[in-house]
Design a protein with these regions (language model features):
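Positively charged n-region of N-terminal signal peptides that target proteins for export
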Residues: 1-4
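Bacterial N-terminal signal peptides
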Residues: 7-19
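Aromatic- and Gly/Pro-enriched helix-to-coil junctions and flexible linker segments
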Residues: 21-162
């Protein structure tokens, strides 16, 4: 039993390091592009739309998925890279301020224009569908054709709210 506990601890450590590296890369890339003064591919990246996020992406975090917990259950006020605002008791949705905070937090896990280059989409996706194997919440999305995965990908590609 102790061997499994040690293995689990190592997996958690590796995952934490990956998330820290992803977060640092997300923060460093824009700063490097700005300081170099050179045009970069990121300048051509689509802007992430807050209204699309609020109306189409946030509900996915609250949605119960078959055989899985809601994203929110593990990621509210957590120390994960995906750290969603905690809902007040009795509230089914976030306030405007909380949604703005969620938008800022979740945007750090996105490489605009590149769904598979975005931790937000790659991490909960099944490895055989292009995801990674480190999501402790399981395979939230079995394929890139999952309607919710496609909605997240649309947002990352710059889809605007209608």
């Amino acid at each position: 039993m102790y061997r499994w506990a040690g293995l689990f601890g190592i997996v958690c450590l590796v995952f934490s390091l990956q998330m820290m590296i992803a977060r640092a890369s997300a923060h460093a890339a824009p700063a490097a592009a700005q300081s170099s003064g050179a045009a970069s591919a990121s300048s051509d990246a689509p802007a992430l739309d807050y209204d699309f996020f609020k109306t189409r992406v946030e509900p996915i975090f609250l949605k119960k998925r078959p055989t899985h917990a809601r994203c929110y259950v593990c990621h509210e006020g957590a120390s994960h890279a995906l750290n969603l605002a905690k809902l007040d008791a009795g509230n089914a949705n976030w306030t405007e301020e909380e949604s703005r905070r969620n938008f800022d937090t979740v945007s750090q896990l996105v490489n605009p224009g590149d769904p598979l280059g975005s931790t937000l989409l790659r991490h909960p996706l099944a490895p055989e569908a292009g995801g990674d194997a480190f999501h402790s919440g399981g395979r939230q999305f079995g394929s890139q054709t999952d309607p919710d995965w496609k909605t997240l990908a649309d947002w990352v590609r710059g889809q605007k709210a209608k």
